[in-house]
Design a protein with these regions (language model features):
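Flavin-dependent oxidoreductase catalytic cores
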Residues: 1-170
């Protein structure tokens, strides 16, 4: 959805409805590239706040069209992606999907909805689910446990005030 960027102090534009099919087809092209490179399996990342996860999570998906609102609507883009992926994968390439069990914060995906997403992914053709949790932008410690290399992570940040803010607050 359009609004403030969770990853940097900028504003973002939500994908237009007419852009979604091309984005889904890009996933299918990626599967074809993996096949050409000799892989016999692919993992689709639908967790941690990446694109599919942003459609699934009620926290980030504020769309007013048929891709937002109810869980059924929020799963539409995922279904579109999986159709392209499964078509490209054929019957001889395994498809795994990494997905969140919980987003890790109030207003995000919870286990009751996740169970429905998991069932849908199996219906869509996924051979395995890789269960995870958290949003790297919203709850990084939920995703990355233990000590984080803050100085290394901030080394390449362009905004000095963001760099020092992250170093001071973690």
């Amino acid at each position: 959805s359009s609004g403030f960027n969770l990853y940097s102090p900028t504003f973002v534009r939500g994908l237009r409805k007419d852009e979604l099919p091309a984005m889904a087809k890009a996933y299918g092209r990626s599967v074809n590239l993996a096949r050409e490179a000799g892989f016999d399996a692919v993992e689709i990342h639908a967790g941690h706040g990446y694109l599919i996860s942003q459609f699934l999570s009620p926290y980030t998906n504020h769309r007013k069209d048929e891709y937002g609102g109810s869980l059924e609507n929020r799963m539409r883009f995922m279904d579109m992606v999986m159709e392209e992926v499964m078509q490209a994968a054929g019957s001889d390439m395994a498809v795994l999907v990494k997905m969140n069990m919980r987003d890790g914060f109030k207003g995000g995906m919870e286990i009751d909805e996740t169970m429905q997403v998991a069932k849908r992914l199996v219906q869509d053709g996924a051979q395995a689910l890789v269960l995870s949790g958290g949003f790297v932008s919203k709850a990084p410690m939920y995703v990355m446990r233990g000590e984080m290399p803050i100085k290394t992570m901030t080394h390449y940040m362009n905004c000095w005030w963001l760099k020092y803010g992250v170093r001071m607050a973690g």
